[in-house]
Amino acid sequence: MSGFFITATDTEVGKTVVAGALAGVFRELGYNIGVYKALQSGHVASNPEGDAARLKVLSGVPTKEDEICPYSIEEPLAPRLAMKRAGRAVTLKDIIHHYNERLKEFNSLFVEGAGGLAVPYTEDALVIDFAKELQLPLIVVARPTLGTVNHTVLTIAYAKAHGLTVAGVILSGCKECEMERVQENKVMIEELSGVPVLGLLPFFEGEFTKEEVLESAKEYIMISKLEEFIRNESTVAHTSSN
């Protein structure tokens, strides 16, 4: 298996934009990559404002929205609570099954979590339990502003304590007028966590196009560093199968 698990320090930080943009860029580079978000609350999968629809558009995958996200609910709550209130029972086994179904279509998947790693996810697991099952390297998406050093370092420490590999951090929503502080936060995160900040993705104001997002990802994210992970994972997987 190869790909990335995209998590964040909080909700509404930019995971979907990052996950979709990275998948879109890698697909342009010729990689057979899909996207997967097991559970979504706040919108049903078919809603164009929801994460599943945005992942589909940004990545350019042919997968249907309800296959990208097999479990979705309208109420904007933590997934476990939203599903419980809707009378739906979703287990870790269920979402792993759908993950494996997507792997029949793609060589690699970029998997988006929900909120942060400690979010109650299925009825029997947190987001981090799902990440541990997949054993994909993490990309941590974080805010660029005040408070992000603490949130990001804690997220990385939590991931490492559970045996997960953190490929890097992407600060999302960076504004030109704040770049001096953003750069200071970048340096501090790297010093305190030992994990590289691989990108400073700009703030997208108002409506934006797929092309604008992908071009920004190419310009502001170290795609080559992430490509090394994909290649190394593919090599390990190939060696293990022989």
From Swiss-Prot:
Gene3D superfamilies: P-loop containing nucleotide triphosphate hydrolases
Record flagged with keyword Glycosyltransferase: no
Keywords: ATP-binding, Biotin biosynthesis, Cytoplasm, Ligase, Magnesium, Metal-binding, Nucleotide-binding
SUBUNIT field: Homodimer.
Biological process annotations from GO: biotin biosynthetic process
SUPFAM superfamilies, per the entry: P-loop containing nucleoside triphosphate hydrolases
Cellular component terms per the entry's GO annotation: cytosol
Function according to Swiss-Prot or TrEMBL: Catalyzes a mechanistically unusual reaction, the ATP-dependent insertion of CO2 between the N7 and N8 nitrogen atoms of 7,8-diaminopelargonic acid (DAPA, also called 7,8-diammoniononanoate) to form a ureido ring.
CDD domains, per database record: DTBS (cd03109)
Domain of life: Bacteria
Protein family: Belongs to the dethiobiotin synthetase family.
UniProt name for this protein: ATP-dependent dethiobiotin synthetase BioD
Keyword Cytoplasm: yes
GO molecular function, one term: ATP binding
Organism per entry: Bacillus cereus (strain AH820)
